[in-house]
């Protein structure tokens, strides 16, 4: 319905105006390199939001990339330090919760994946690349997201929250 495009345009225009420059009597505004993060996406989800700005006879196309959480592997999240995606990593399994909830092997696999997440967060804190308060907050946020998202799937919720819920990272 264009709501997201309008919001992004407004946010970016505000940022551009805050950082405006006057050079030789000309106002320069530089729009930020923004992106939108989609927690849920499917094959119909576009790769970018598009806005066309018409000025007289000229058209300027403004494109805002869409980052889809499910397209990022854990390896990429840690490699690129996209840690803010960790709490939402569980969204990739949302459509499979019913199946995972009743399948011991899939539950074990999910738990192992989150044990890996917790271990990687621990490593990031020990190495000094991440502050312990950030690691703890990510664990808590991941736990909160799982509790809400998987509330109807007790086994899924239990396996992930047992791993992420009790993590206290002190260094």
Cite the ranges covered by each PLM segment.
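Conserved single-residue anchors adjacent to enzymatic active/cofactor-binding motifs
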Residues: 1-168
